[in-house]
Amino acid sequence: MATRRRTAIAEALTRLLPRVPYLDAEAIRAAAGARHMRDLSTGAAVWLAALAHIRHAHTDYDELRDEGYERDEARYFVLDDTNRTLERWGSVRRLQSVEDDDPAEADRIDP
């Protein structure tokens, strides 16, 4: 990953989630810098990476999927937990619905 993009990701993460724990920040930075995120703005890549990390590491999302829930159903059930984590980490943004983390809408998410 180019140094300029890496720096921009770190800055966007600090703006979006000022109180994110270090290990979580490392995972989010790595995901935001992944090849499939390159076409997104830096802010959108960080936002989507943060949502995915929170969903998989800090909610029951994976367990719900293992129990047979569809993706959007599982996302709906972990929406409140996701928002609580965003609040704890200092984000002023919240998810209103499961569509708020749709990659098709990501470029309008810049912090």
What are these regions (language model features)?
Residues 1-111:
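Structure-specific DNA junction-binding interface
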